[in-house]
Amino acid sequence: MKVAVYPGSFDPITNGHLDIISRASKVFDKVIVGVLINPEKKGMFSVDERVDLIKRVIKPFNNVSVQSFSGLLVNFMENNDSNVMIRGLRSVGDFEYELQTSLMNKKLNPNVETVFMMTSLEFSFLSSTAIKQVAVFGGCIKELVPDEIIDDVLRKAKEFN
């Protein structure tokens, strides 16, 4: 069974993230969405809230699950019998960053492979940071995040502001 891990902060999960999850679920036997616990980074949503939001939007995918993790990604992958990491790319800038991260992970565990998936064109401008800014300032996020979580993002944006 080929298990892939799709790591990130997902604060919040976007339609771009969901697009990568959907496409990866067709390539791999199992996809684990790994939500990074980063105590140095204050997110809009707590880690538990992010896991809950993701659980709600991945229901249609039988082979996708979500877990939070802290520490090294390669250790999380090893604990989940995975040697494949999925990363979405929107731009050349993403590639530069992801290449360095991929090489470091390869150095830490030579068995880890990174699969880069190009973001679909309609989502190439999306980022969780941009969505938070739009939501905080009262803009429309309807086509930016999954419908199931729009109300959660808008409610949290009011609190965050």
Curated annotation (Swiss-Prot):
Grouped into one coarse class, the protein's main location is cytoplasm
List this protein's GO terms for biological process.
coenzyme A biosynthetic process
Q: Where is the site labelled Transition state stabilizer? A: 17
Q: Where in the cell is it found?
A: Cytoplasm
Instruction: Provide the reaction this enzyme catalyses.
Output: (R)-4'-phosphopantetheine + ATP + H(+) = 3'-dephospho-CoA + diphosphate
E.C. numbers: 2.7.7.3
Needed cofactors, names only, are: Mg(2+)
One GO term of the cellular component aspect? cytoplasm
* Pathway connected to this protein: Cofactor biosynthesis; coenzyme A biosynthesis; CoA from (R)-pantothenate: step 4/5
Q: Which residues bind substrate?
A: 9, 41, 73, 87
Q: Name one GO molecular function term.
A: pantetheine-phosphate adenylyltransferase activity
Q: Any idea which positions bind ATP? A: 9-10, 17, 88-90, 98, 123-129
Q: Which Gene3D superfamilies match?
A: HUPs (3.40.50.620)
**Assigned keywords, A-Z:** ATP-binding, Coenzyme A biosynthesis, Cytoplasm, Magnesium, Nucleotide-binding, Nucleotidyltransferase, Transferase
In terms of InterPro entries, this protein maps to: Cyt_trans-like, PPAT, Rossmann-like_a/b/a_fold
Q: What SUPFAM superfamilies would the database entry show?
A: Nucleotidylyl transferase (SSF52374)
Q: What does this protein do?
A: Reversibly transfers an adenylyl group from ATP to 4'-phosphopantetheine, yielding dephospho-CoA (dPCoA) and pyrophosphate.
Query: Which HAMAP family does the UniProt entry name for this protein?
Result: PPAT_bact (MF_00151)
Q: Which family does it belong to?
A: Belongs to the bacterial CoaD family.
How this chain assembles, per its entry, is: Homohexamer.
- PANTHER family xref list: PHOSPHOPANTETHEINE ADENYLYLTRANSFERASE
Task: Please give the name of this protein.
Answer: Phosphopantetheine adenylyltransferase
Q: Which organism is it from?
A: Clostridium acetobutylicum (strain ATCC 824 / DSM 792 / JCM 1419 / IAM 19013 / LMG 5710 / NBRC 13948 / NRRL B-527 / VKM B-1787 / 2291 / W)
Q: Which gene encodes it?
A: coaD
